[in-house]
């Protein structure tokens, strides 16, 4: 089967985990990994797996006679904002795993196929990938005037990039709750849990709903979205059934549905407790595969 050629820009933990997922893909063939640290473990692992590697950054990749069909970038927002127009000029499609948000945001269960023609798509945040689908599941059944998510992740799984971008995380995720999740107003909170041994990612999703909402339909919609996510993140699961509460002072006089989920990683490179990172690489792979299928069908 013909596969779309892929370059991974970035050689850190996320890029390395992504590499293992891409290698299993029926549609994507990782051939290059680009970094800036010649001693990085990611580049060393990529070389052992037969990829062409360079520590000379994006300039090296764009100067190669053969260009990739897709690039997955897991560097920083600043680096990707600089590189994105260069990828587009070279005819390379980009899947952005940084907070740069140059292109439209994609959450597979909600809007996977809406932006397959875009030159650049953004994967929002780990918290967004884990929680926005649940908001979407509720909002496609009833109006959601307000939604709030709390993402709790192991502190050791949050690298310097995550810590430096907490404000961007909350703003980007909150915006995604509204624009993709379908809530009229959204709020996001992230908690870095220092527990040892590290805890698996856990998320709480609150949605305000009409008092007379069809609770069975909402529950069914949530279960269907969870099943969709489990196709590419097997460790994604509900901790219990969605909980419905009647209007109260605590909820601002609105009825609510609360959903609790946890995300256990596949353990490809990152440890299983780092489900917050695993769901990003898994979702990016899913999006890349859909883009590749469209590219290859056009070429055929």
UniProtKB/Swiss-Prot annotation:
Q: Name the Gene3D superfamilies for this protein.
A: Dihydrodipicolinate Reductase, domain 2, NAD(P)-binding Rossmann-like Domain
Q: Which GO terms describe its biological process?
A: catabolic process
Q: Which Pfam families match?
A: AcetDehyd-dimer (PF09290)
Annotated active site: 126
Q: What is its EC number?
A: 1.2.1.10
The record's listing under InterPro entries reads: Acetaldehyde_dehydrogenase, Acetylaldehyde_DH_C, NAD(P)-bd_dom_sf, Semialdehyde_DH_NAD-bd
Q: Which reaction does it catalyse?
A: acetaldehyde + NAD(+) + CoA = acetyl-CoA + NADH + H(+)
Q: Which residues bind NAD(+)?
A: 11-14, 157-165, 276
GO MF annotation list? acetaldehyde dehydrogenase (acetylating) activity; NAD binding
Q: Which UniProt keywords apply?
A: Aromatic hydrocarbons catabolism, NAD, Oxidoreductase
Which protein family is it in? Belongs to the acetaldehyde dehydrogenase family.
Q: What NCBIfam families does the entry give?
A: ac_ald_DH_ac, PRK08300.1
UniProt-recorded name of the protein:
Acetaldehyde dehydrogenase 3
User: What organism is this sequence from?
Assistant: Rhodococcus jostii (strain RHA1)
């Amino acid at each position: 089967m013909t596969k779309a050629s892929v370059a991974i820009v970035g050689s850190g933990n996320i890029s390395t985990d992504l590499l293992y997922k891409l290698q299993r893909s029926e549609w994507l063939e990782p051939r290059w990994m680009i970094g800036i640290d010649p001693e990085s473990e990611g580049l060393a692992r990529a070389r052992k797996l037969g990829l062409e590697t360079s520590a000379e950054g994006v300039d090296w990749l764009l100067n190669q006679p053969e260009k990739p069909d897709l690039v997955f970038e897991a560097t920083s927002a600043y680096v990707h904002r600089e590189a994105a127009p260069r990828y587009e000029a070279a005819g390379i499609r980009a899947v952005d795993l940084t907070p740069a948000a140059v292109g439209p945001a994609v959450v597979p269960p909600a809007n996977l196929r809406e932006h397959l023609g875009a030159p650049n798509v953004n994967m929002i945040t780990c918290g967004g990938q884990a929680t926005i689908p649940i908001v979407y599941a509720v909002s496609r059944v009833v109006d959601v005037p307000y939604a709030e998510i709390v993402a709790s992740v192991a502190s050791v799984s949050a690298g310097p990039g995550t810590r430096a971008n907490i404000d961007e995380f909350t703003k980007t995720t909150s915006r995604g709750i509204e624009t993709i999740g379908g809530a009229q107003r959204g709020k996001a909170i992230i908690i870095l849990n220092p527990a040892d041994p590290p805890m698996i990612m856990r998320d709480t999703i609150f949605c305000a709903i009409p008092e007379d909402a069809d609770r069975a339909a909402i529950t069914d919609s949530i279960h269907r979205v969870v099943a969709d996510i489990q196709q590419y993140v097997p460790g994604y699961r509900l901790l219990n059934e969605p909980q419905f509460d009647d209007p109260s002072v605590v909820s601002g006089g609105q009825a609510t549905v609360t959903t609790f989920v946890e995300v256990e990683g596949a353990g490809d490179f990152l440890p299983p407790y780092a489900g917050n990172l695993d769901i990003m690489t898994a979702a990016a792979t899913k999006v890349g595969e859909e883009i590749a299928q469209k590219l290859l069908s056009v070429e055929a």
